[in-house]
Amino acid sequence: MDILCSPPYPLPMKNDLPFIVGIGASAGGIDALSQFFKGVPAQADIAFVVVTHLNPDRESQLDKVLEHKTEMAVRVATDGERVSAGTVYVMPQGSFLSISSGRLKLNELSPGTREHQPVDLFFSALAEDQKDNAAGVVLSGGDGDGTLGVKVIKEQGGVTFAQVADGEPPLNPE
């Protein structure tokens, strides 16, 4: 997977916040995430928020996996944490993420809840909060989660990307 992650110009800061990229992936998207972050320079003036479909009954090691794939700081998102450049935030298990005024908000899943669209929920909140200071990237998965969220990001002036299945011609960002 070829990904261009280093623009030839500095990205604008909005309200002292870096450009924020939401990345949505299915539970099987570890390889795609690993490849993505191998191409991101450590000094990137970007913050990344990774939203995945996690099994609430199994402990996630995604933050540890990504730490070995990038020189950027990687950490599990905490409630109220202000997003900062050069950091990869990973959605914690048993919750879903939103964002308000550049601060991550954790919302716990109700017990027994399995069916939700965490990527759409985060992307929609990101678009409303950051407008054109946001991008959405959908990696792997066929359940449609992320489809509505990227529409909202695009409507608010942000940029959207989607992974192309192997063997298909690459698409330009919209």
Q: Where does each model-flagged region fall?
A:
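Conserved acid/base catalytic micro-environments in cytosolic active-site loops
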Residues: 2-174
